């Protein structure tokens, strides 16, 4: 039983990245799909797709990791900020920058998932899901 599915997703991506795997499979959900979409738009992963597995009711989100031409990892780190035991909410002016703006903070707002830059631009606050650099 997984208590925090987003932390589990981040851990699977981090571990696969450390082992230089080409892809990683995580149980699928709408929130995880939204996070994968942001990671792809920001260039941290190369692609993602939803796969259905026979004899299972839940589909799988397959994330294709991205590496440089020299084989180095593009995604240096990924961290969960708001946890199920301690939710972190920030207003649009208090949204944190990851590594001085070099990374991306993922925020869940009333308008859906978005990056910290989009939230500041639209002047929307929300729950800080995690950060990527």
UniProtKB/Swiss-Prot annotation:
Chain segments annotated as coiled-coil in the UniProt record: none
Family named by the database record: Belongs to the universal ribosomal protein uS8 family.
A family per Pfam: Ribosomal_S8
Disulfide partners: none
Gene Ontology BP terms: translation
Function text: One of the primary rRNA binding proteins, it binds directly to 16S rRNA central domain where it helps coordinate assembly of the platform of the 30S subunit.
Protein name: Small ribosomal subunit protein uS8
Organism from which the protein derives: Endomicrobium trichonymphae
GO cellular component, one term: ribosome
HAMAP family: Ribosomal_uS8_B (MF_01302_B)
């Amino acid at each position: 039983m997984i208590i925090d599915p987003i932390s589990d997703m981040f851990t699977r991506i981090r571990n696969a990245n450390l082992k230089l795997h080409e892809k990683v499979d995580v149980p699928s959900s709408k929130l995880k799909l939204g996070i994968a979409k942001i990671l792809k738009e920001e260039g941290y992963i190369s692609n993602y797709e939803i796969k259905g597995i026979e004899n299972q009711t839940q589909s799988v989100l397959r994330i294709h990791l991205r590496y440089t031409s020299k084989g180095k990892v593009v995604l240096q780190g990924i961290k969960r900020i708001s946890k199920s035991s301690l939710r972190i909410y920030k207003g649009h002016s208090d949204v944190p920058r990851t590594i001085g703006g070099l990374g991306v903070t993922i925020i869940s707002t009333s308008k859906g998932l978005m990056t910290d830059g989009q939230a500041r631009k639209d002047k929307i606050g929300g729950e800080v899901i995690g950060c990527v650099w």
